[in-house]
Curated annotation (Swiss-Prot):
Cellular localization per UniProt: Cytoplasm
Database matches in Pfam families: DUF150_C, RimP_N
Keyword match Cytoplasm: yes
Key word Cytoplasm present: yes
Predominant localisation class: cytoplasm
PANTHER family: RIBOSOME MATURATION FACTOR RIMP
Protein name, entry field: Ribosome maturation factor RimP
SUPFAM superfamilies: YhbC-like, C-terminal domain (SSF74942), YhbC-like, N-terminal domain (SSF75420)
One Gene Ontology biological process: ribosomal small subunit assembly
Species annotation: Synechococcus sp. (strain JA-2-3B'a(2-13))
Length: 156
């Protein structure tokens, strides 16, 4: 369940990240820890760069100033800024560009042509379709039915 403050916190952090040259990937507020932890995952807008310690530090310092200014989070908390690492789920436009040619598994609901799960090599994604290569044959899956696209180690 998403913490109720996350939408406000994201609307504060997203433009700040962009101004510094980063993409806000995810923000999670772990209130079951004492003190609570606000985890912010960023990555550079430049797809040829990896997230560095200096990137995390710059975002942390800038975000800390803004969070103190708006005072949305009551009490003490820990701000943790890091890289999302490598996730096997593809969600952003950038993911679909970076992982073009990689083996993926696509889950659909409703199924397409009687299949709910398709495996192949990613060719790309546009507004209407996710394109895969299945043993050299191009298949275009309806994007509206795609529930998840994950990196895979095998293709059938």
């Amino acid at each position: 369940m998403v913490h109720p403050l996350i939408p406000q916190l994201e609307s504060l952090a997203r433009p700040l990240a962009a101004q510094l040259g980063y993409q806000l990937v995810q923000m999670v507020f772990h209130t079951n820890q004492h003190p609570p932890v606000l985890r912010v995952d960023i990555r550079p807008l430049d797809p040829d760069r990896e997230t560095s310690h200096a990137d995390c530090e710059a975002m942390s310092q800038a975000l800390e100033v803004e969070l103190d200014r708006v005072d949305l989070i009551p009490g003490q908390y820990v701000l943790e800024v890091s890289s999302p690492g490598i996730s096997n789920l593809l969600t952003s436009d950038r993911d679909f560009v970076v992982f073009k040619g990689f083996a993926v598994e696509v889950t659909l609901d409703p199924p397409y042509k009687g299949k709910a799960v398709w495996s192949g090599h990613l060719l790309g994604r546009d507004e209407e379709r996710v394109a895969l290569s299945l043993k050299g044959r191009r298949v275009q899956l309806p994007r509206a039915s795609v529930q998840r696209v994950a990196l895979s180690s095998e293709t059938d």
